[in-house]
Amino acid sequence: MQVYLVGGAVRDKLLERPVKDKDWVVVGASEADMLAKGFQQVGKDFPVFLHPKTQQEYALARTERKIGQGYAGFECDTSTNVTLEQDLLRRDLTVNAMAMDDNGNIIDPFNGQKDLRNRVLRHVSDAFEEDPLRVLRVARFAARYASYGFSIADETKTLMANITQSGELSHLSAERVWVETAKSLLEDTPQIYFETLRECGALKVWFAELDCLWGIPNPAKWHPEIDTGIHSMMVLEQSVRVSHKLSVRFAALVHDLGKGLTPPEEWPSHRGHEKRGLVPINTLCERLKVPNDCRDLALLMSEFHSHVHHAFKLKAATINDFLDKCDVWRKPERFADLLLACTADAKGRTGFEERPYPNADYIWQAYLLAKEVNVQEIVQAGYKGAEIKQQLRQKRIHAIATNVA
């Protein structure tokens, strides 16, 4: 029975990146052997065990044979005869197909170290094509390691396109797609994930509402980058600078989906795209089973980003009604996130990246002023029923007006 550190832990150790999770592979052991040593079995599809002390994952060395469609369509062999090299052969990329023994020796049968040095993401074997999830995983790795200078090998891009053309991507579960997408959104260069998927044709399979934005023009005066798809990627890139939150980055990504529904004869104008975007955002979120907090912020962002962009032109009453519609009184943190996403939108344009965006502070200040209005004082003044709400609105508008002035 031999134990090896494998996969991402070895890769990141060699890259001198922090190692977050350690995965181990066990060669020459059976399920009974692992249970006898006190390990707890947790894997449903194949035998994975938790170490009794560290709770790290230990998997029996295995081979895989494709027998069906999608991510789960595999038959596994975890017999004691499976070698380490056979286990590494089934992995996705050469940089993930290395192992380390107890003495720190690297076992690298597929030249993963060479690809690490050359900053290349390359598939291990043609079996790569058997698992459609790998298209998303490689796109995620491309997003994670872009800042290290990594790029995807041309032959691997070809296999990713082949998988897309085969129709296999549609057999993935929504949950799997969202997990990979959410992880990618939290990387330092999340736009690379979506650009990679678009390059191999995969974006239109799961993100059709986003994919259709490329080629749709915006007015050059406000969008020197012109293309709505490019703008969406620039906004996502800027969202990394303003927030670590998944909901903010997702809202930044999908804020302009309404422009995909603008009649071409109206281009490059997109009047009304804000509310038009609500349907495609809901459709996308239902398809991917996006968490409610991400969906809700994305819907607010779509409907109201133009309000924030035109903040200095809005009347006090309009600002107050906008605050009401955003439910800021009960959800101020979400409203703050909306303003962050709007900041990313404003800066996600060619030549606007470093320009100040005072609109967000202006709207936040209006909220703080309106928040100071004391409803108890209105009640104590003798107002009742609908009068209370009316007085509260008037006093808030008056408070906001001091900021507008």
UniProtKB/Swiss-Prot annotation:
Pfam families: HD, PolyA_pol, PolyA_pol_RNAbd. InterPro entries: CCA_bact, HD/PDEase_dom, HD_domain, NT_sf, PolA_pol_head_dom, PolyA_RNA-bd, tRNA_CCA-adding_enzyme. One of its GO terms (biological process) is tRNA 3'-terminal CCA addition. The keyword Metal-binding applies. Keywords: ATP-binding, Hydrolase, Magnesium, Metal-binding, Multifunctional enzyme, Nickel, Nucleotide-binding, Nucleotidyltransferase, RNA repair, RNA-binding, Transferase, tRNA processing. Mg(2+) binds at residues 21, 23. Catalyzes the addition and repair of the essential 3'-terminal CCA sequence in tRNAs without using a nucleic acid template. Adds these three nucleotides in the order of C, C, and A to the tRNA nucleotide-73, using CTP and ATP as substrates and producing inorganic pyrophosphate. tRNA 3'-terminal CCA addition is required both for tRNA processing and repair. Also involved in tRNA surveillance by mediating tandem CCA addition to generate a CCACCA at the 3' terminus of unstable tRNAs. While stable tRNAs receive only 3'-terminal CCA, unstable tRNAs are marked with CCACCA and rapidly degraded. Monomer. Can also form homodimers and oligomers. A single active site specifically recognizes both ATP and CTP and is responsible for their addition. PANTHER family: MULTIFUNCTIONAL CCA PROTEIN. This is Multifunctional CCA protein. It comes from Pseudoalteromonas atlantica (strain T6c / ATCC BAA-1087).
